[in-house]
Amino acid sequence: MFNLQKYNYDTEEVVKKITNFKDYYGQKGGVTLSGGEPLLQPEYLIELCKKLKKINVHIALDTAGYGIGKYEEILKNIDLIILDIKDITEERFKNLTNGEIQKVWEFLKIANKLNKKFIVRQVIVPDLHYNKEYLIGLNNYIKKHIKNIQKIEFLPYHKIGDQKYEKLKIPNPYKNKKAMDIEKCNKLFEEFMKIYNNKNSAL
């Protein structure tokens, strides 16, 4: 609805802008907090969510689950978590994010304790995820670490993000990766859901 790029807004200014559009999105809409990684700004996130809840705004958090703590306080006012899975293995997660996957597990443990709803998203990178072995591992990972799942989605990896890495002059872990074909991604999702819906496939 509005572009916050290149500007710094305090929480009052953000809430004011959102309030101006409340008649537009009504009872069925709300606010999605994304990034970057919103969990890396816990104090701001906590303050903003408290103010949004006072005006009864539905709040979704789009996150990779990798932050710096205060998860319980953040999640108290979150209605829905849109979880972006980077990878399920410790080594590849480290290579792609330069972070530790255990931090994601910590976030998920607290979210599950609070019975938060999840939409789970997996971006499919052909070189990394387009194989049966990964699908089986992903099924086990989801069933082990994530509860109260409302929906699972596969998204095809694209190269649009390369420009962002170049602009910010930071290393791009996906630089040599190919884009994912949409039809192949859809077929892979169908194959995954057969595994996921098989009651005997859980760990």
Spans of model-derived segments:
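Canonical Radical SAM [4Fe-4S] cluster-binding loop centered on the CxxxCxxC motif
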Residues: 1-8
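A general structural-boundary detector
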Residues: 1, 32, 91, 172-175
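Conserved AdoMet/S-adenosylmethionine-binding subsite of the radical SAM
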Residues: 15-160
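Radical SAM enzyme [4Fe-4S]-AdoMet core and its adjacent flexible, acidic
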Residues: 8, 122-203
